A protein has these predicted regions:
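A short beta-strand-loop structural module common to alpha/beta enzyme folds
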Residues: 67-72
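Active-site regions of metal-assisted phosphoester/phosphodiester hydrolases
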Residues: 1-65, 76, 86-87, 91-95, ...
Length: 289
């Protein structure tokens, strides 16, 4: 027969002990989501221009920050960025690299966090297609991030020599604010896993996972990339492979989970990065034996 113990005023009931899973969940830091998505001008792999599919993929992602590439309004008369802003409720930051009388084409940044500073980085090289990057400082709310977050969203060129020059310019810009929590993301168009642009960026950011995002129906190439400084802020990286994402664009979105309120560590100095660049360049230029 069980005994019944009376509960007296002033008694404090002891909490039930946590299971190991509950304890791990309570100790885990909060996270937020960042994505990069080349939307191919809203044209799907079936050749149809359907912006609502892009909006649908963004709804699936539920990311807090999204870098977009190939955002186009020049040939359709349709303002893609305004449409996506209105459909999703994000703050929209344009970063056109081509501006003509009939519209614009280039990058964009969608964010739930208001920007406190935005500038454009010109990455154009010679007669190649104009390229650029959006360099935005976002004011994250308490509980998401301990300090302003710097986000650089870009789309690099198609030619190896072009990309090398563009990455050098990005490294110079990154070195202007050492120690600031930073995310660099976008379509880097780097087909070679050991190409110098990737090695330079991996050296600066202490590496990053590579995830295949192209082509969307059967991805084999990691053209879309994301790096974080400090490296410890990056929790996971994956491609978003929903049925809608496989048809809405020729790229899959790249989705990363970032730890909130990371410990800030000093980024490499510009001198250290320059030394690393020179060393990597010498190694790459040496003939194989």
């Amino acid at each position: 027969m069980s005994r019944i113990y009376p509960f007296r005023a002033g008694d404090v009931a002891e909490p039930m002990p946590q299971t190991p899973r509950e304890a791990a969940a309570a100790a885990a830091p909060a996270q937020f989501l960042v994505a990069s998505y080349n939307i191919h001008g809203g044209i799907g792999v079936d050749g149809r221009f359907l912006p609502k599919r892009i909006a649908g993929v963004l709804s699936e992602l539920q990311a807090d920050i999204v870098a977009l590439q190939e955002v186009e309004s020049r040939s359709t008369g349709f303002d893609m960025l305004a449409y996506l802003r209105d459909e999703t409720g994000y703050h929209a930051i344009p970063g056109p690299t081509l501006t003509r009388h009939d519209g614009e084409y280039g990058n964009a940044l969608l964010t739930r966090f208001p920007p406190s500073r935005v500038r454009q980085i010109d990455l154009s090289v010679g007669r190649h297609e104009p390229r650029g990057a959006i360099d935005a400082t976002l004011s994250c709310p308490d509980g998401v991030h301990a300090a302003p977050l710097r986000v650089i969203a870009t789309h690099l060129g198609l030619w190896p020599g072009e990309r090398r020059m563009q990455v050098r310019r990005l490294l110079t810009s990154l070195a202007e604010q050492p120690g600031v929590p930073t995310v660099l993301l976008g379509d880097v168009n780097e087909w070679f896993l050991w190409g110098r642009p990737l090695r330079w960026l991996h050296a600066y950011f202490d590496g990053a996972p590579h995830v295949a995002t192209f082509p969307s129906r059967m991805p084999v190439l990691a053209l879309d990339r994301l790096w974080c400084c400090p490296r410890s802020v990056l929790a996971s990286v994956s491609s978003h492979r929903s049925p809608l994402a496989r048809i809405a664009s020729d790229h899959l979105p790249l989705l990363a989970r970032l730890h909130a309120r990371p410990a800030v560590t000093a980024a490499p100095t510009s001198a250290a990065v320059a030394d690393e660049e020179e060393d990597l360049a010498r190694q790459a230029d040496q003939p194989s034996r």
